Amino acid sequence: MSALNSLPLPVVRLLAFFHEELSERRPGRVPQTVQLWVGCLLVILISMTFEIPFVALSLAVLFYGIQSNAFYTKFVAILFVVATVLEIGSLFLIYKWSYGEPLIRLIIAGPILMGCMFLMRTHRLGLVFFAVAIVAIYGQTFPAMLDYPEVVVRLTLWCIVVGLYPTLLMTLIGVLWFPSRAISQMHQALNDRLDDAISHLTDSLAPLPETRIEREALALQKLNVFCLADDANWRTQSAWWQSCVATVTYIYSTLNRYDPTSFADSQAIIEFRQKLASEINKLQHAITEGQCWQSDWRISESEAMAARECNLENICQTLLQLGQMDPNTPPTPAAKPPSMVADAFTNPDYMRYAVKTLLACLICYTFYSGVDWEGIHTCMLTCVIVANPNVGSSYQKMVLRFGGAFCGAILALLFTLLVMPWLDNIVELLFVLAPIFLLGAWIATSSERSSYIGTQMVVTFALATLENVFGPVYDLVEIRDRALGIIIGTVVSAVIYTFVWPESEARTLPQKLAGALGMLSKVMRIPRQQEVTALRTYLQIRIGLHAAFNACEEMCQRVALERQLDSEERALLIERSQTVIHQGRDLLHAWDATWNSAQALDNALQPDKAGQFADALEKYAAGLATALSRSPQITLEETPASQAILPTLLKQEQHVCQLFARLPDWTAPALTPATEQAQGATQ
């Protein structure tokens, strides 16, 4: 700890980030890492044995292709086959009509690249067009490197083998031989979330970060999509299982902030918590067996009173609703999403995005051809890889690519100087490469915030030490050239994406926040009563709120990287946005607490007050886009005598008023958090 205290704050934050990423627990991560690791070693063995070129490209296919579950791996493998046909076909067309004419070749390749980048952003199968764009621009380097058309054709045909045999390999490993099914990952994930919930129910633990809670909720939703596509039994009983996922998410996120020591430890409360934990354990056992859980628990009057006293009544109701739900309930028909985004042909940003990518590639190609420096062809690949919809995400990808390339270059340098002279055969080579590939595979299976570092590290290492050589290599020039090519491409892309039609999210962020607060207002309008339909709607919208707040958080991080904005305005926007996100999360949990007390009352007394809260929140959200939002001030009216039996409800609603008053005032020249107390609210 003393060593960390002596380090600069940015270094400490970087170390904390990598610790979080490398220690991430995710169902399916270990099998995916092992599959990727074994696949990389097999690719090296096969490529070296049969002298197949472009080993780095084969490794890249594996890193992009092997996914967290068998269904996703199979789906990506099919896309890769289609992409290989399209990309090789486009290359042959370019070579046929313009092999000896670089200008004509670029004129033909340019529209292909633009079309691919446009479709990558607007089409559901954007990964296919991304692969075609990569090969279309990479293939322009073949005629420049070689003067013999026959050799270029052979290299292009080799690209078919290089792309397809790793695809076959990952299908055998990840789909046929050692499949990791989404259904088993879902069972494990649900049980892990319930284990965390029980721990917070029985012990006084520090709450987990809200960002982690939201990511876990989104991970369950993604697994649910894969289970629907991959498992017939899950599809048959999908309504029950989707309700199970929503219930587990609610229990997990709510108990994360639960502190059992803040309530009196009466015998009735202790027994109720034990009973609730026992029911959760029964649900876990049913999930492990892959069965729909049915409960015969009927809450007695004393248990209901104990649940209300320890603020667990709503959790109890959601659990019982799941246990009494018919497993054969017909699912709600899901709307099929369109293949293209709605504004694909009306929003000029998509075409501008394609033009910017083409411009960056042409600048790099001109420099690459002008200096006649064959080794820096990675600059053009970099322009395509780091091309993202907005400035912030492009900078994020640039940092990841540069970081991965730097680590890969350092490893390649050490490998060439210290290890390569001592190697005599392929077995020794595989033993030395094994820890490098294992590290890259583990990083590549982390979250999207850092996974590309692992991919880029291994690809850069392979480009510098294993590319098109089938024996010991001691040329350090390759390491220098690949790294410089990536740096050149990163610099050119940064300049283009910053100054040519920059797509800033600074204006989109307030709209995103308004959408999240609008969903929160919908939650407040749902009748607070023990009714199945209302409860299910409440849980589903609550999951949507997790996704909305997480998206706003990620957008804040991207806006922080947009250096073309005024620094003071950017800092003010980020500070206000983070305050809204924080207060929105607190409002959601505070509103959960009002449900526990309001359920015991006649619901007819509640809609007016709930509507008052929702109206104030909608008014605040409506002014975010124009920066006209002020902190809502809500006055609570006198409590009717019929509600005096539950004074806790009044205190909880007063707390909601305080949270409303702490929302930032967007009309102020500087962010001054509201410290004054809301009218009608008490501390």
Swiss-Prot record:
Q: Tell me the GO molecular function terms.
A: transmembrane transporter activity
Spell out the protein name for this chain.
Answer: Multidrug resistance protein MdtO
Q: How does it assemble?
A: Could be part of a tripartite efflux system composed of MdtN, MdtO and MdtP.
Function comment: Could be involved in resistance to puromycin, acriflavine and tetraphenylarsonium chloride.
- Name of encoding gene: mdtO
What family is it from? Belongs to the MdtO family.
Q: Matching PANTHER family, A to Z?
A: MULTIDRUG RESISTANCE PROTEIN MDTO, P-HYDROXYBENZOIC ACID EFFLUX PUMP SUBUNIT-RELATED
Question: Which GO cellular component does the record give, naming just one?
Answer: plasma membrane
Q: Where in the cell is it found?
A: Cell inner membrane
Q: Answer whether the UniProt record assigns the keyword Disulfide bond to this protein.
A: no
Q: How does it sit in the membrane?
A: Multi-pass membrane protein
TM region(s), chain numbering: 43-63, 75-95, 100-120, 125-145, 158-178, 402-422, 426-446, 457-477, 483-503
One Gene Ontology term of the biological-process aspect is: response to antibiotic
Keyword Ligase belongs to the record: no
Q: Which UniProt keywords apply?
A: Antibiotic resistance, Cell inner membrane, Cell membrane, Membrane, Transmembrane, Transmembrane helix, Transport
